[in-house]
């Protein structure tokens, strides 16, 4: 877990985490993939970019989770000493609110029915760790995204 979670100590730590999170992503421009004949899919809205390019939801969710962790890290490290008014480029409450909503939708859409029990002695409730979950085949999803990528960039948050 510590490989992907901030220890709230420095910008250098967050830069290392950003690189690790980027390695979780397929080789695509963030979340954009090319869809042939989108008019053949009645549920698709207009593409986000011409080509036509569409956003893949699981990437968007991972992006939002990283963004929220980054904002929380910034708040913990800079908030108490008055630097909370000094917001770095890329930070925004609108983006943060959007990411909370994306993750809410994800939770309600996937409705993971894993039964969690057995909490850690220091935790009042369940930690959620150590339980068997049924997941999608990650490699199949990555292969499809890389095959249909718009270009060869990788990013977790646009810098």
Swiss-Prot record:
<comment type="pathway">
    <text>Mycotoxin biosynthesis.</text>
</comment>
<dbReference type="InterPro" id="IPR021765">
    <property type="entry name" value="UstYa-like"/>
</dbReference>
<dbReference type="GO" id="GO:0016491">
    <property type="term" value="F:oxidoreductase activity"/>
</dbReference>
<dbReference type="GO" id="GO:0043386">
    <property type="term" value="P:mycotoxin biosynthetic process"/>
</dbReference>
<dbReference type="Pfam" id="PF11807">
    <property type="entry name" value="UstYa"/>
</dbReference>
<feature type="short sequence motif" description="HXXHC 2">
    <location>
        <begin position="95"/>
        <end position="99"/>
    </location>
</feature>
<comment type="similarity">
    <text>Belongs to the ustYa family.</text>
</comment>
<comment type="function">
    <text>UstYa family oxidase, part of the gene cluster that mediates the biosynthesis of the secondary metabolite victorin, the molecular basis for Victoria blight of oats. The role of vicYa within the pathway has still to be determined. The pathway starts with the processing of the precursor vicA1 by several endopeptidases including kexin proteases as well as the cluster-specific S28 family peptidases vicPa and vicPb to produce 7 identical copies of the hexapeptide Gly-Leu-Lys-Leu-Ala-Phe.</text>
</comment>
<keyword id="KW-0843">Virulence</keyword>
<protein>
    <recommendedName>
        <fullName>UstYa family oxidase VicYa</fullName>
        <ecNumber>1.-.-.-</ecNumber>
    </recommendedName>
</protein>
<keyword id="KW-0560">Oxidoreductase</keyword>
<feature type="short sequence motif" description="HXXHC 1">
    <location>
        <begin position="60"/>
        <end position="64"/>
    </location>
</feature>
């Amino acid at each position: 877990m510590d490989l992907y979670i901030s220890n709230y100590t420095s910008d250098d730590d967050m830069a290392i985490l950003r690189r690790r999170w980027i390695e979780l992503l397929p080789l695509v421009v963030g979340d954009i993939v090319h869809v042939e004949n989108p008019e053949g899919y009645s549920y698709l809205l207009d593409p986000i970019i011409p080509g036509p390019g569409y956003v893949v939801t699981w990437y968007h969710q991972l992006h939002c989770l990283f963004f929220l962790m980054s904002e929380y890290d910034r708040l913990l490290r800079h908030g108490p000493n008055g630097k909370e008014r000094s917001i770095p480029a890329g930070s925004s409450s609108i983006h943060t609110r959007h990411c909370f909503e994306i993750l809410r939708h994800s939770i309600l859409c996937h409705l993971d029915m894993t039964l969690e029990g057995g909490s850690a002695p220091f935790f009042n409730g369940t930690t959620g760790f150590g339980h068997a979950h049924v997941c999608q085949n990650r490699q199949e999803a990555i292969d499809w995204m890389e095959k249909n990528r718009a270009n060869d960039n990788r990013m977790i948050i646009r810098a």
